[in-house]
Amino acid sequence: MKQIWKQTWRQRLAAALIQLLMVLAMAGVGIRMPVQAAEKNAVTQSGEMKVHFLDVGQGLSILAQSEGKTMIYDGGDRKTSRFVVSYLKEHGVSKIDYLISSHYDADHMAGLIGCLNAFDVKNVISSNYVHTSKLYQSFVKAVKADGLKMQHPAVGKTYKFGSGSFEILAPKTIEAKGSNNNSVAIKLMNGENSFVFTGDAEHESEAAMCNSSIDLSCDVLVPGHHGSATATSWDFLQKTVPEYAVISCGTNNKYGHPDKDTMDKLQSMDIQVYRTDKQGTIVVTSDGANLNWSAEPCNDYTPGDDSDQGTQSTSEVQQEASQTATGEHVWVSATGNKYHKTNHCGNMNPNTAKEETREEAEAQGLEPCKKCY
């Protein structure tokens, strides 16, 4: 009997131990899962990043701040150099981790010389060409005086910046004449939010960016060359598909910036517009998922020159000529599976669109664009 009782007791003890181990194993999984979830959240969540679009009149200057790191992209003209330096100091800047000169035109570069003299600068990124101006020589001298070298990174190079990063988009090549298409363009990223700055890059540089394998999509685009007609092509807008555009230009500037053609494109694509000539300095804060602006968009799509009537594209002329044709005519893009009422729908490039009858479009299996119909 004792032997049977011992055997039964051992069996019960073994069963109890097995049950205990199972409970502990399950408890261990329960403990580990929240830790793993926390680790995953730490990866997907981003810290705060502030982007300031400074009102430097007819010029460009953008300040970015994140987790103690600072970037200045262009510094505006001579007459606003003191303002830029003062603004940075007022916002707690003592050092600049990345000073980026998109190109060497005075309305972009002059204020950077003041920044080099006033702050501890860690890195200078600029375009790999030489300008003939005395201002350029002053810039080079200021860089050397700080014991720095001008870095000319290749397209695709990525830098860590605070809670995010930025990637070089342009220039792919350097033009011997002119400087606008030599502009250093970047995509600044923080979690799911992103910004594209292109300096004075024009259509040729934009085309090179579009033909690269880099994802150009962004939440915020600063239209190139202050909203000039020489930049912000349809193809570039369709690649960037921004929700917001921030135009940096001077009030009643002599160039007529922003151009009517550019503003018409932004309006046709329902892109929300901010303008420094109308609203002054604009600040946006990113938490990696959402954008919090210092002001509402002005959505003022009027050109800088009231007499600017824009240009009429060939496709628009064709549209007018076909108005007398029988049957409903629609517009079809070179790619895509929709047809459109107008070639300026905003969801297609009007310069590559072709016109045909609705019956022909539907026979190809195309469906009506939800924005047009």
Where do the model's predicted regions map?
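Sec-dependent N-terminal signal peptides
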Residues: 10-26
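Low-complexity, intrinsically disordered Gly/Pro/Thr-rich segments
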Residues: 270, 280, 352-358
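SH3-family beta-barrel domains
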Residues: 313-337
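Beta-loop motif signature
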Residues: 335-353
